[in-house]
C-alpha cells in the first residue's frame, strides 16, 4: 500500500529511507542535505562509494547503508545535477533503482520523499508515481511530503 504522509521524512518509523542521489558525490541539497545533516555517516559512505565508481557504473544502482538501526537507500538515478530547471533524473535508472529496492527490501517498510526525482531532478511526477505504483504494488511504502504544496 502506498500512503502519502505530511511531515519530515526523517521522522518516519520505517525500516528504510530511500532517496534519489546523483552520481557525482554531491549531497548538497534537498533530502540528501537533510540526511547529511541528520547522520553524517550516510554521506561519508555515499561519498566514498562515489569515489571508487564511475558515474556510468553508479547510474541505476542502489547503495544501502545501515546507521543507527535504519537502512538508508541511496538511489543513483541522476548522473549529474544542476539548479537550472533541467531534467536530471534518468527515469529508466530510477525504475531500475526502485526494482532493486523492492527486491532487497521486500519484507521491510520503506519511506521516500513525495515527488522523488521531480523537485530537484526535474522528472514528471505523474510518470514517476505510476512507476512507484507498478513496482511497489503489495508493498508498504510511505511518500513523505514536507509541505502540502
Regions found by a protein language model. Give the residues of each.
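Macrodomain-like recognition of ADP-ribose-binding/processing modules
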Residues: 1-149
Amino acid at each position: 500500500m502506498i500512503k502519502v504522509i505530511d511531515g519530515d521524512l526523517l521522522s518516519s518509523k520505517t525500516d528504510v529511507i530511500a532517496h534519489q542521489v546523483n552520481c557525482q558525490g554531491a549531497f548538497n541539497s534537498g533530502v540528501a542535505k537533510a540526511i547529511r545533516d541528520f547522520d553524517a555517516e550516510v554521506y561519508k559512505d555515499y561519498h566514498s562509494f562515489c569515489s571508487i565508481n564511475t558515474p556510468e557504473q553508479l547510474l541505476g544502482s542502489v547503495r544501502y547503508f545501515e546507521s543507527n538501526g535504519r537502512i538508508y537507500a541511496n538511489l543513483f538515478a541522476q548522473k549529474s545535477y544542476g539548479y537550472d530547471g533541467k531534467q536530471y533524473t534518468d527515469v529508466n535508472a530510477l525504475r531500475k533503482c526502485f526494482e532493486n529496492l523492492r527486491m532487497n527490501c521486500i519484507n521491510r517498510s520503506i519511506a521516500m520523499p513525495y515527488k522523488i526525482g521531480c523537485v530537484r531532478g526535474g522528472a514528471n511526477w505523474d510518470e514517476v508515481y505510476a512507476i512507484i505504483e507498478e513496482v511497489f504494488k503489495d508493498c508498504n511504502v510511505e511518500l513523505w511530503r514536507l509541505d502540502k504544496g
